[in-house]
Amino acid sequence: MGQLVTLFQSIPEIIEEAVNIALIAVAIMCIVKGTVNLWKCGIVQLCIFLLLAGKRCDGFQIDRRHKLESVEFNLTRMFNNLPMSCSKNNTHHYYKGPEGTNWGIELTLTNESVANYSNMSAIRSLAYGNITNCDKTNEAGHTLKWLLNELHFNVLHVTRHIGARCLTTDSAGILIQYNLTVGDYGGEVGRHLIASLAQIIGDDKAAWVGKCFNNCSANGTCRLTNCEGYTHYNYLIIQNTTWENHCSYSPMSTIRMALNKVAYSSVSRKLLGFFTWDISDSSGRHVPGGYCLEQWALVWAGIKCFDNSVMAKCNKDHNEEFCDTMRLFDFNQNAIKTLQLNTENSINLLKRSINGLISDSLVIRNSLKQLARIPYCNYTKFWYVNDTITKRHSLPQCWLTYNGSYLNETHFRNDWLLESQQLYNDMLVKEYEERQGKTPIALTDICFWSLVYFTVSVFLQLVGIPSHRHIVGQGCPKPHRISRNGLCSCGYYNIPMKPVRWVRKGK
């Protein structure tokens, strides 16, 4: 301890010696370089891994500055004027009423009739929305009308409800029964009805789409293809029910129903343009420079912002599910909140807007992937690469779903590695453009040619170009300049034909 105190007391005297300063510099360099080498060798990372393995996961660290993160959207408020939809199992599907209601509509496949046909009247047509006799709840009429319209007009193009009857008793609520075995001159209506319902719901239901060809490969893997609307159930029952969180809500069913004839559409509509993107803080004040999602739009984390570079990619390319979702959020923020319309007008407006905001090709592509039992996008969770230093993000990509659960990060490892590399490239290009804009071209030229001059001078110095002649066996003749014959014009060297040689400067 005394030696340490003595060392600190003698620091001023030590620094005065140049040799001591050199030793201190060498010691610091060795310590720093040794620490860097120790970190690069991997022993520290191994110790950290052994301590935290199986106990903690801070996220997917791609490299020293890039990290794989995700954002999950809450779409319930966006579609608060539309019925919420979900499936409990192969036979029960539910539609919840708009926001602020506690009722719902239950769709059930069964082999047992719920009522005697003598107590029910036939539904002739929906051409004029004539279902008032079937709705005794005075609250679900519009939702029921919208549901039946979508099932029959927009998907099936069927104006007559073959085999459909409803209960008309007062205070009986809603009870509509379809006989799926009844046919018509145009084909089996029940089969088309099940096909359209499965298309809207979008779930892979063996009981709803059961007539398929089972294609098996050589390795034993089998896949159902060319599925048609078919079910072994005889009746489809539509009735009112209370909403008791029967199942988890998914926005895809609502989006599919709002998109008119999406399954048969082969030409994509022209998408509506974006609004002006800007950042809004937690209090709602707008700050130019990017786009922030409000708290209601996220499942977790209070607020999430994306910079202008991400939004610019959406404005340029309309081929990402994330861009579709951002259009819906932006429309909901700037249009729906300013409207004072009743439920029916709001639904019609939102349907028309969704048709111009959502890309047909993306929805069709994901629907086909879901039917083919390969990973697809459900428009709720997106992953992106975050630069922890500059806080820049890559364009979020959809986190694909398979068998009702999200894929593990390792399943799309190549994708986020490519996004990380692209983020690096974008950063380098941006820094280069900024540097070019701040540096005068003349100064850049001077710097370049001075570097060329320095490089040439170093090369010439290494080559060793001779500068004057010497007479062999004698000293340097300077300041005399000897000719190739060994003579000097002043007469000091006057004996001709002596051997001479070229010598570099200083020799």
Curated annotation (Swiss-Prot):
Q: Where is the lipid attached (N-myristoyl glycine)?
A: 2
One MF term from GO for this chain? metal ion binding
One protein family per Pfam: Arena_glycoprot
Q: What protein family does this chain belong to?
A: Belongs to the arenaviridae GPC protein family.
Q: What keywords does the record list, in alphabetical order? A: Disulfide bond, Fusion of virus membrane with host endosomal membrane, Fusion of virus membrane with host membrane, Glycoprotein, Host cell membrane, Host endoplasmic reticulum, Host Golgi apparatus, Host membrane, Host-virus interaction, Lipoprotein, Membrane, Metal-binding, Myristate, Transmembrane, Transmembrane helix, Viral attachment to host cell, Viral envelope protein, Viral penetration into host cytoplasm, Virion, Virus endocytosis by host, Virus entry into host cell, Zinc
- GO cellular component entries: host cell endoplasmic reticulum membrane; host cell Golgi membrane; host cell plasma membrane; membrane; viral envelope; virion membrane
Q: What is known about what this protein does?
A: Stable signal peptide (SSP): cleaved and functions as a signal peptide. In addition, it is also retained as the third component of the GP complex. The SSP is required for efficient glycoprotein expression, post-translational maturation cleavage of GP1 and GP2, glycoprotein transport to the cell surface plasma membrane, formation of infectious virus particles, and acid pH-dependent glycoprotein-mediated cell fusion.
Q: Which organism is it from?
A: Parana mammarenavirus (isolate Rat/Paraguay/12056/1965)
Where on this chain does Zn(2+) 1 bind?
Answer: 57, 480, 488, 490
| Extracellular face residues | 2-17, 54-58, 59-445
InterPro entries given for it?
Arena_glycoprot (IPR001535), Arena_glycoprot_zinc-bd (IPR043015)
Q: Does the keyword Acetylation apply?
A: no
Q: Which GO terms describe its biological process?
A: fusion of virus membrane with host endosome membrane; receptor-mediated endocytosis of virus by host cell; virion attachment to host cell
Positions annotated with a glycan in the UniProt record: 74, 89, 111, 116, 119, 130, 179, 215, 219, 240, 378, 386, 403, 408
Record-marked site positions (Important for GP-C-mediated membrane fusion): 33
Residues in compartment: Cytoplasmic: 33, 467-507
Cysteine disulfide partners in this protein: 86-247, 292-305, 314-323, 377-398
For this protein, the parts annotated as crossing the membrane are: 18-32, 34-53, 446-466
Where do the annotations place Zn(2+) 2 binding? 468, 470, 476
Q: What is known of its domains?
A: The cytoplasmic domain of GP2 plays a role in ER location. It also contains a zinc-binding domain that allows SSP retention in the GPC complex by accepting a cysteine from SSP as the fourth ligand.
Keyword Glycoprotein in annotation: yes
According to UniProt, residues marked as the site described as Cleavage are: 58-59, 272-273
What name is this protein filed under?
A: Pre-glycoprotein polyprotein GP complex
